[in-house]
Amino acid sequence: EVKTSNGWNRGNMSPEAVKECFYSLEIPEAVSGYAMQLKPLSIPGKRMYKGYQIKYTDTGFWKVFSFRFLTGKPFTQADFDSGITQAVVSESVARKLYGTTDVVGKTVIIDLTTYTVCGVVKDVSRAADTAFGDVWVPYTTDRILMTNTSSENMAGWFSICLLAKDSRDFEAIRHELLKQIERYNGMKQDAKINFFENPITRFDIAIGSIGQRKVDVKDYLLETGSLLLFLLLVPALNLLGVTQSAVQKRRAEMGVRKAFGATYGVLVRQILYENSVITLIGGLVGLLLSLLLLPVCKDSLLQSRDT
């Protein structure tokens, strides 16, 4: 959030804020600023009207996340600093454009700007929403992203991801960031930037935390645990009813077996064994169906938060 005397701007940050507040951090192992835009791709003689996720980022992105390069390599710091139009594309995009992954040195046109492909990476799962993209390019190549800012050049289009050397460094990183924020705010006349609870971890995000509000683990376990127990109660009651119905149908059989010397413990163990087998078979069938349906439904199930 950026506050001024005229109001506040709650959203992403500018390239200047990325540089002054985050690139100057010394405790994290790697820092990366990025912005995402949905744009069509084209090559000479072929235009693709479908929107692809273009990730505008820096060289730190390749340190924060581990990509498998099939050919080529990521753009360099020199490319980034000079605004050289280099691009890393995903395997599926390379095949869509040229029918092969051997496309290093070939061109791709993004928003009327021609980029040279410097690397091809294995497709990234949509579940990895921050790392996911179709094309990755230096954000210094996009003039609009670099200049379209507000609130004394504090607010813009960018987000940040950090890689800590150790989980014990989280608090130290937050304290170091507060010092950088104080220094940066001192450079401005009126505007003041504030990141609230940020940076937050992937675990924090998974339990529902956002930049303005951090969810406590105890509260999450209490709320989510209560909901899960309620949801599990329904199938548990159904299973109990099925078991009781099966026992009622076999009362005569159990009476005969008990008359021939079967103990109560033997009868109970048999019932538990039979129901466990049925439950196991049902679980395996459900797992198999999930594995079969996931490739078909992955586009709708794993939509990126950026789209």
Q: Whereabouts are the PLM-identified features?
A:
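Hydrophobic alpha-helical transmembrane segments of multi-pass inner-membrane transport and secretion
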Residues: 1, 215-252, 280
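Transmembrane alpha-helical interface segments in multi-pass membrane proteins
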Residues: 253-298
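Active-site acidic-Proline motif in GNAT/NAT acetyltransferases
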Residues: 166-167, 249, 275
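Membrane-helix entry/capping segments
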Residues: 183-227, 249, 294-307
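Conserved beta-strand->loop/alpha-helix structural units within folded catalytic cores of enzymes
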Residues: 108, 237-238, 274
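Mid-to-C-terminal secondary-structure elements
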Residues: 60-74, 85-213
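Structured, solvent-exposed hinge/loop segments at the ends of secondary-structure elements
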Residues: 1-97, 101-102, 109-115, 175
